[in-house]
Amino acid sequence: MLAAHARLLPPSLALAPSLQNEQRLASHILGVTSPDNWHSSFLRAIAPAVDDVCATGSAALIELQARTKDADPDGLLAALDLAQTGKEVLPVCRRLLRLPMTRGRAASTMARSMSIAPDGRQLLSHQPEAHLDGLQELLKGAAYKALVDYQELVSQGGRGAQSKQITPDATVHPLTSSTMHLLRRLMEFQPTVDWLLATKPQLLAAGSTREYARGVLRDHVHSLQSRAAHHVKDKCRAAVPHLFLLNNLHYITSNIRTGFNDQPTAARLQQFVGDDLLRVWVHSSEVNKETYFAKSWDQLLTFLDDPVERLQEQRGSKLLTLESGRVLKAKFEGFNNLLTQLHVVFCQCSVPDQGLRAQLVDEAASKVAPKFSRFYAQFSTVPFSKKNQAKYLRYTPDDVERLLRDAYGGVTVAQVASPEHADDDSDDDEIS
């Protein structure tokens, strides 16, 4: 909350009950017993509070303009908070200024009695109602501009070069978390946002808070997809943009469904966003998960097809022919190299949601580890390399299982590979 906004509340909250208890205030607190002087004394007493509202409201507006220049969600929420307070408080001030004048007192005299304190200090401008009206319009304008600026920020995907980039570790983008935070808080300001959208010029297509929130979320998801589509990637990193989308879409859909771990909020969020958008994003999340696996861990399975029909032994011997030995070498070497590359890539990636991370790890392990174990058991004892059998048997089934399960945990390949399986770079094309 803005500091100036905090200062605005005490005097403003005192105005409404003061208005309701004008006679008691004038009679018992101010010592005025004549009904003819009730209004005059009352208005003179509350003039400092009205003046304080105007002064602190103006100060809050200056502070707000500085805070909302970067279109951050906290600045937008502060603008809505202040506009909502102005919507509630300033009409009370205006009503106070419109109280009927007492008999026998000229309007000009009454205005002077309100605008000058006993110590001679100027309290209100010569046109206090115009001051209040102008302040309310400025507060409304600042809040409306903050709504427009944030929607533009989201539609552009952020600012500068980063607006076209995915996060380096494929994690949830900061704009995703801030937009979801804004969505949750927008529900609290729904009457105020509806009021702003109904009374300001239609720079925004949305006619309600719900339409605005849905539009911002749609624009943000589109910008995420655009980032992923334009991400420069090599073969081993082809799955990273899909992990990025999966992380972000999962964050959006799971928090809409759970309401940030609050069931009443979840029900309101789902109604606010709508089942139509939620279904689309859940489906997109599943598609990106499938594509992520197809371009990463599933590629390992291509090296584990059973090559028995293609293997031939040398005549009169159980040793493999040169060509058959090369078949097994290519399979083990291809698997080892790709596993190493994928592990290096995904050690640098992050999956912040523990449930999603466990799901991805378990699925990769269940697909690859059993098939590699069978392949290893069947062919690791076959002498397909004269000098460098250990080079091709670099990873044991336990190593592979560990690599798959530590893929997002920052464990290096050197820490996992068995020491006795160190590489030997010498050539070995002959089996004898």
Task: Label each region the model flagged.
Residues 1-432:
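Long alpha-helical rod scaffolds of large eukaryotic non-enzymatic complex subunits
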